[in-house]
Amino acid sequence: MKEIEVYTTQDGKCPFLEWRNSLSTEYKVRVNKRLQRMREGLYGDWKHLQNSKLSELRLDFGKGYRIYFKELDNVIILIVAGGDKSDQKRTIKQADKYLTDYLNRSKDNDN
């Protein structure tokens, strides 16, 4: 079983959870079920993004919801952002920044 880690900014904000919590109860439950399947190694509909270190988990409900993540060491899945098809480019750009921040802070903590 894989561990899921959710990105948190330096000031303690969690963009993914803020996005997920903005969804209806039905969609929150469906997102949580999908994340549970990811923990079990069952990713479903996903792809690596071009020109990015991120991958995109495509959800077949709502407004074309997407979850952006990075698998690290084949164990930890870092969930960095969520959004829908209408704001996809902006969300990916921001998720790339979040991933860079996460990796930089992780490197700093290793020293």
Task: Kindly label every feature range from the protein language model.
Residues 1-36:
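Solvent-exposed, charged helical/coil patches
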Residues 1-9, 28, 43, 62-66, ...:
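Enriched for short, Lys/Arg-rich terminal
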Residues 12, 52-53, 74-75:
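Beta-strand-connecting loop/turn residues
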Residues 16, 45-48, 86:
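Short, electropositive, low-hydrophobicity segments enriched in small/polar residues
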Residues 23, 35-38, 95, 102:
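Alpha-helix boundary/capping residues
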Residues 33-59, 109-111:
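A short, surface-exposed loop/turn module that caps and links secondary-structure elements
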